[in-house]
């Protein structure tokens, strides 16, 4: 997202900041110094747009004052933008020792013995039928549950083409088809077809995320009523839900579906990196 702001204020010709932005007849903007680099029309003094070839005469070229002002604002805010839109390493001191709650796992999810990895399978695991279990959707919850404090965990989605991670309310529906949306108690980011990313807002929010996203960092701050998602590989911010309700416990949420019959991709909870993090004084309730 920080890179997106930089692209907005760059001249497409010299790639420098558009501090003296001008606009052609068609709306194309570049810096004043780069006007001379534009091709002239064959039989006149008009300038050809690099993208659409619309001719702009001298009177058509106008200063773009709003863009100039935006450049100034973004440059002034850039240090703050970097701190807000990048992952803070100090989040890891709130990393929690998390496992999957088998009692909630769909029967077609094959969960590892250490309760930290799972994949989708063809055969039912014949676990006990109970109300806590997702009986249709390929989902599982994590433990512990959270009612207060700050908590951080990382999920390795590997080569999975279809997945969703985040949190959900303790009371979410687990029977039959579920709707992953904030209205129904799910605060998640997810992927479809390995390249389409979205947050579970209403309506859905498309996300600009690297297709190479393999590890997602999740930071839940119950006191601040927010949950933020990061690309751990480059530290880039993915999305933040704000003003989240705090009327009941939040549960870590995981969903996974095979992209094809041969897909053996695995979704995993990453191990605690800081050895002292598991015993850090975070406020949560165990299962």
From Swiss-Prot:
GO BP, sorted A to Z: innate immune response; regulation of gene expression
Quaternary structure (record): Interacts with PSMB1, UBE2A and CCNB1.
Name under which the protein is recorded: Ret finger protein-like 4A
Residue stretches making up the B30.2/SPRY domain: 78-276
Cellular component GO terms, alphabetical: cytoplasm; nucleus
Alphabetized GO MF terms: ubiquitin protein ligase activity; zinc ion binding
SMART domains with a match to the protein in the record: PRY, SPRY
Keywords: Cytoplasm, Metal-binding, Nucleus, Zinc, Zinc-finger
Main subcellular localisation: cytoplasm
CDD domains: SPRY_PRY_RFPL, vRING-HC-C4C4_RFPL
Zinc fingers (RING-type) by residue: 11-53
InterPro entries assigned: B30.2/SPRY (IPR001870), B30.2/SPRY_sf (IPR043136), Butyrophylin_SPRY (IPR003879), ConA-like_dom_sf (IPR013320), PRY (IPR006574), RDM_domain_RFPL (IPR022723), SPRY/PRY_RFPL (IPR037960), SPRY_dom (IPR003877)
Location(s), subcellular: Cytoplasm; Nucleus
Domain of life: Eukaryota
Transmembrane stretches, start-end: none
